[in-house]
Amino acid sequence: MKYMIASASLLGLLASPAQAQLQAVSDLTLNAAQKLSTAAMAACEAKGRQIVVTVLDRGGNIVSVQRADGVGPHNTEASRRKAYTALSTRTDTQTLAANARANPDAANLTTLPELLLLGGGLPLTARGHIVGAIGVAGGGGALHDRACAQAAIAAAPELDPVLLPTKETP
């Protein structure tokens, strides 16, 4: 009798398909990435600054890159690395750079080849979940780059606002 009950229970478990639990995630669209890039370019241009802006999706793939006329080629790679750093660490790169200067353990982050600890990279979140990152370079300094990235996020109502320290505003 015990054998029959155990067998029936086992057959019941095998017969019912296990339901896979899939996580619903938000993806950054090409349209959204282009709007962010355009907003960052406009914010910097309004201040007389020429930049390169790179937007990555949550997987670290480049979705959009825009470069103003005359911006040095090294800034294209710098903007990508700032975005990658913000995405990978889920941290504003200006804050990350300050932490690395203040903390010897965090200073080791500078030895990782893809990370760039300069201001201008911000993670992009929607409803509390990372959806990508933006990186700005060439705007005349880390604080200017960060301000243009922040202005782009502020112009995208579908993204969560970025709360940054106010004492470092250019």
Label every PLM stretch briefly.
Residues A20-P170:
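Flexible, solvent-exposed loop/hinge segments and secondary-structure transition points
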Residues M1-S7:
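Bacterial N-terminal signal peptides that target proteins for export
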Residues A15-P17:
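N-terminal signal peptide c-region/cleavage motif recognized by signal peptidases
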